[in-house]
Amino acid sequence: MSTLQDLSKVLSRKQAILEESAAGVEQQKKSGKQAARERIALLLDGGSFVEQSMLAQDAGVVAGSGTVDGRPVYVFAQDFAVMDGAMGAKQAKKIVKILEQARKTGTPVVAMCDSNGARVGEGAAALEAYADVFAHMARLS
């Protein structure tokens, strides 16, 4: 496969994620809530958000970095539009990645939580995911 074909595949996946998210955003608005990306946009300086791991399917969290009043921050917002924002292994992996980057750089983290809890279908792995996230958060406190 060529680089151009690979790029096309990535862009198609990104578009599919945004379209899936749009349906969930409408449901959020009906509930009187803002979507994850909207909450991040309201917090950060305009145009400063750099999303990380966007193509992680069904993670249920939007994560990245940006600035608040010109100061760098890492941020993550659970996305209730994806599996009610429930925490599982994929979501924890994205969050832990952000927390580790913040620890290495001494940069603050803003967490926007909107979740129904753990992904019970993942069983003990979901609880382990929570434990991993909370352990990393405790190290940053």
Residues of each region from the PLM?
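Terminal-region recognition feature
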Residues: 1-141
